[in-house]
Amino acid sequence: MRFSQRKGLVPATKVVQRESIDDDLRASLWNLLTLFYWRKFQGRDEDTYRSDEVAGSNLEVLMYSIWINHFKQPIDTIELYWQNCLRRLRDYFFDGQWYEVYDFVEFIAQNGDASSRDRFIEACNKHLERENSAYRFVNGQITEITSQQEIEEIESAIQRSDSFPGGINALKGRARVNVQQD
């Protein structure tokens, strides 16, 4: 607990963020995107005038996927240089509605570098919990939850149902219905 919370100057706990994202949560999620994905940018190895072009970089395929499948915009609107592209992504992220932020984070988790996926999702869940969000990643999707116990129960049930053909889809549907009814 911070000094200001102990002194009663600011609330000790935040209101659950169900249909909103405050600045702290938004910044936390952006920082995770930066640490797990954006900072890993590597331009092409060729001798070129600039090495920060998106084309030929390790993030080129992800940028195409974002523009084609998430933004649904023409790929010729992707910025040529990484810093400009990153600025555009950042503006979208910080200017977007709360649900657009979750859509974007979920999209990156599902389409970004697979080697970072599990650690990224784990880090997101820690920050979502810390910032009192009503959402967590469950089975690769951002889902509304009510408690840590509920997350563990859903994930455990999904893992158990993998041994029963067809069971996973029924369980996933039931979990979504139960969580949304709260």
Enumerate the language-model features and the residues they cover.
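Long, contiguous, compositionally biased segments that the model treats as domain-scale units
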Residues: 1-53
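Internal, Lys/Arg-enriched amphipathic helical interaction segments that engage polyanionic partners
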Residues: 43-173
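A cyclin-like helical interaction fold
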Residues: 174-178
